[in-house]
Swiss-Prot record:
One of its GO terms (biological process) is sodium ion import across plasma membrane. One of its GO terms (cellular component) is plasma membrane. This is Sodium, potassium, lithium and rubidium/H(+) antiporter. The gene is nhaK. Transporter involved in the efflux of sodium, potassium, lithium and rubidium.
């Protein structure tokens, strides 16, 4: 029961962090989550979870890095292979040497091998933290790709260096030749293991499909299990589990690119399932990180052997050392390449870009998990020197780098924000065209003999939307006014429906379907769409996982009586028209007429439209609606991808989500 309650508290903290971020958007979600974790763990009766490093790596790091390997563009990483290797290998080992000697010089009680171990575990940047922080600023695309590539590789190099430094501290023996050979063996073995295991897992899934086992839920479960299987197998063999899951993610991305068209439904369901899993895992990483800090700090602050201000100074000096070393490494490499290419193919080094790279080097959960894996005793049975201090210093550096990135990255990218604001309308139009094209592409890929007619009709609808966007500019003021008037009409319909119930002209049970429909429309036209996982989206996800069928809804309630439905819908639409006319003025007259025209079409369909239950039309409309919801979800995923890749900022993503919610509202209105 305690474990269950702890999980509920953690999930509640994740949800709370996103709610808080809506009110204080200038504070990044990861920092809020760390703060909430600290707050909950600070109370004696609060939540205290001991960090098991092995469990942490397999439960959190494996699926997160697997997903990063899947979604990071392979061609762009290959083009940046030289700088990525220089950061993931060269900078890591430079950090171990420079920071290690600095730590030992500053704190003589920490032996040199242990200082190297601390420097090694501080060398990897946290790809999860980098992605979370960079999404709120306009990070240049090239820098973002470089950071992603670095984050995928330097966890392994840092942990291997940490492992050998710990071994040297525990045993007192170290061989540079043996360490170098082992590093190559562990790294290459991890990559090879990830590729081979992924290949066999993919072949196994193809084999199941050839047997006719195309159940979406089963294949998604196999996908979820994949990173855990790869990581555990690689670690059992003795190679890098981290590099194995990265290689596995890249291999699965290649398989996804080649996936047959009739598996588009699986792609959509898989994408939405992983979005939820990653949302929870990302949040848990930072909340658990915050939960560890009070306990770690208490051990040091209550120990009279340590001066509190002195250990805080140690943290600041180590952080400064890491930042200076990273800046010099990036600047010198950039300047050297610029000079070597005779200033033709490489841009001149810029201070702003170098500073962005420097402060994006956030340390995170991998660092703390590695620090907690330090053994308690040496080979002779004596305590590991300054173990608690090393863990405290690691936690302090994590906090410092996280705060520095949160404060400085938005300032360094402010100029780009202003440039984007100048042509906001143009960028929104461009993004909307890209979204509609992605929906058309999804419909084409998912087309088969069974849905060909429906897919072509829907593709034509999206092409019409695309032409409309290209013809006339988007007017935000008019659009906000239209949303307000439509919301007013929906409320008038709700009031009319309630009146019919009270007058006993309609049974309340029969009116349930329309009440639900009006409620969903009200959510989409109001600010409720800001909540990322709304009821509507949850129903869509269940539908894609084949746990909910829309035809079950059609066959129940008021929709069984076609004439009754038409009469009620006509009366509510007429009430909406009357209410809108009463609130019409010179300022909103044009928009009111537009919305009234929509309601007049509804009234006309109720009076003269074709039979609602004509079998062919019903089947066609149902298939079209299902495909349309899939296309809408594809667009939502594309918005998130554009946002995470830094191609659009928060404001543009907000406008695009409003646009998609309007599309979904139209779908609900016409069903």
């Amino acid at each position: 029961m305690e474990i269950f309650l702890a999980v509920l508290v953690l999930l509640a903290l994740i949800a709370s962090s996103n709610i808080i971020n809506r009110f204080v958007p200038f504070i990044p979600v990861p920092l809020i989550q760390v703060g909430l974790g600290i707050l909950v763990a600070a109370f004696p009766s609060g939540l205290h979870i001991s960090l098991n490093p092995e469990l942490f790596f397999v439960l959190f790091i494996a699926p997160l890095l697997f997903n990063d390997g899947k979604r990071t563009p392979r061609d762009e990483l290959w083009k940046l292979r030289a700088p990525i290797l220089l950061l993931a290998l060269g900078l890591v080992f430079a950090t171990v040497i420079v920071a290690g000697y600095t730590i030992h010089w500053m704190i003589p009680s920490i032996p040199l091998p242990a200082a190297f171990a601390l420097a090694a575990i501080l060398s990897p940047t946290d790809v999860v933290a980098v992605s979370a922080l960079s999404s709120r600023v306009n990070m240049p695309k090239g820098i973002m790709r470089l950071l992603e590539g670095e984050g995928l590789m330097n966890d392994a190099s840092g942990l291997v260096a940490f492992k050998f430094a710990i071994a040297a501290t525990v045993t007192g023996a170290f061989s540079i030749a043996e360490a170098s050979f082992s590093f190559v063996l562990i790294a290459a073995g991890g990559l090879l293991t990830g590729f081979i295991l992924s290949f066999f897992i993919i072949r196994f899934r193809y084999f199941l499909r050839r047997l006719g086992m195309d159940d979406v839920t089963m294949h998604i479960i196999l996908q979820i299990l994949t990173p855990f299987v790869i990581y555990l197998a690689a670690e059992e063999i003795g190679v890098s589990g981290i590099l194995a899951v990265v290689a596995g993610g890249v291999t699965h991305a290649i398989e996804q690119d080649r996936m047959e068209a009739n598996l588009a439904k699986l792609q959509i369901a898989s994408s939405n399932t992983w979005n939820i899993i990653l949302f929870i895992l990302n949040g848990l990483v930072f909340v658990i990180l915050g939960l560890q800090i009070p306990d770690v700090s208490t051990v040091i602050f209550q120990d009279e052997a340590f001066n509190n201000m002195q250990v805080i100074t140690y943290i600041l000096i180590i952080t400064l050392c890491l930042m200076i070393l990273r800046f010099l490494w990036v600047w010198l490499f950039w300047a050297g390449k610029w000079s070597a290419t005779k200033k033709q193919n490489v841009k001149k080094p810029k201070l702003r870009a170098s500073m962005l790279m420097t402060f994006s080097g956030v340390r995170g959960a991998v660092t703390l998990a590695g620090a907690f894996s330090i053994p308690f005793t040496l080979a002779d049975g004596s305590p590991f020197p300054e173990r608690h201090l090393i863990i405290f210093l690691a936690a302090g550096v994590i906090l410092c780098t996280l705060i520095l990135a949160s404060v400085l990255l938005p300032l360094l990218s402010e100029k780009k924000d202003k440039q984007i604001a100048v042509d906001l309308d143009t960028k929104i139009q461009h993004a909307k065209r890209k979204l509609l094209r992605s929906a058309i592409k999804t419909l084409r890929e998912g087309m088969n003999e069974d849905n060909r007619e429906v897919s072509l009709a829907l593709i034509n609808d999206y092409r019409m939307k695309l032409r409309n966007i290209q013809r006339e500019p988007y007017q935000f003021g008019m659009r906000r006014q239209e949303k307000k008037i439509r919301l007013h009409g929906i409320k008038a319909e709700q009031m009319k429906l309630q009146q019919l119930i009270e007058e006993e002209k309609i049974d309340q049970q029969e009116a349930y379907e329309l009440q639900e429909r009006f409620h969903e429309l009200e959510m989409l036209y109001s600010n409720s769409f800001k909540i990322r996982f709304s009821k509507v989206k949850f129903l869509r996800l269940l539908q894609w996982l084949q746990l909910w069928r829309p035809n079950q809804l059609v066959s129940s309630g008021i929709l069984e009586n076609e004439d009754s439905y038409k009469q009620i819908r006509k009366k509510t639409a007429e009430a909406a028209v009357d209410s809108i006319k009463q609130h019409m003025n010179d300022e909103n007259k044009q928009t009111c007429h537009q919305v009234i025209g929509f309601y007049n079409q509804v009234i006309y369909r109720c009076e003269h439209g074709p039979s609602f239950f004509q079998q062919k039309d019903r089947s066609f409309d149902r298939k079209k609606k299902e495909l349309n919801f899939q296309a809408v979800q594809t667009i939502r995923n594309e918005i998130q991808t554009l946002y995470e890749n830094g191609e659009i900022n928060r404001d543009i993503a907000h406008h695009l989500r409003e646009y998609i919610n309007d599309m979904e509202a139209v779908l609900l209105t016409n069903t």
